[in-house]
Amino acid sequence: MNKILWKPANKSDTHINKFIDMVNTTYYQDLQTYDDLYHWSINNISHFWKASLEYSKIEYQGTYENVLDNLKMDINVKWFSGVNLNFAENLLVHRDDKIAIISKVEDYPSRQISYRELYKQVEKLSSALRELGVKKGDRVAGFMPNILEAVIAMLATTSIGAIWSSSSPDFGIISVSDRF
């Protein structure tokens, strides 16, 4: 596919360009292109991920000494050891009327939900889960299709610090049973 689908009006306003500028300033580099950034990232894994965390402004608690404990990328790598973050906290940081999610389900009309409404619905469900006794570390499983309400349930669960697991009914009884 060679057709350009979208091109930014001003390259300097893009996040990738702003990130490259930050890397250049922080690490005394002269990266100019995405390809330059890519090569720098694979040769400077810890610096790249530290810069990514800083640029993204992800909220977290704790401190880390090392970005990762093993430069060999295997299944036992520990990233930002000593740091905890809450998925829902970071996804629910916005509370305005901009569109947060567009839901498209086969044979149904599209639905949209704003950040404000998403926050309200997550807050309402997380309160109900707390009233049921769900607390940090508990497990909550959802047997539901991949629809907007599943996202709300996941965010409500993780906002408490509980662990969310879901399975769509399309998987069939045996697959769902194996998964849970």
Please report, for each region that a protein language model flagged, where it lies by residue.
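N-terminal amphipathic, basic-rich helices that act as targeting or association modules
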Residues: 1-75
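AMP-dependent adenylate-forming
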Residues: 23-28, 88-117
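Conserved AMP-binding/adenylate-forming core of the ANL superfamily
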Residues: 36-40, 101-155, 172-177
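A short N-terminal helical cap/helix-turn-helix that marks the beginning
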Residues: 42, 50-63, 81-102
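Anion (oxyanion) recognition and catalysis
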Residues: 158
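Structured binding elements
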Residues: 161
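C-terminal catalytic core of Y-nucleophile DNA break-rejoin enzymes
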Residues: 169
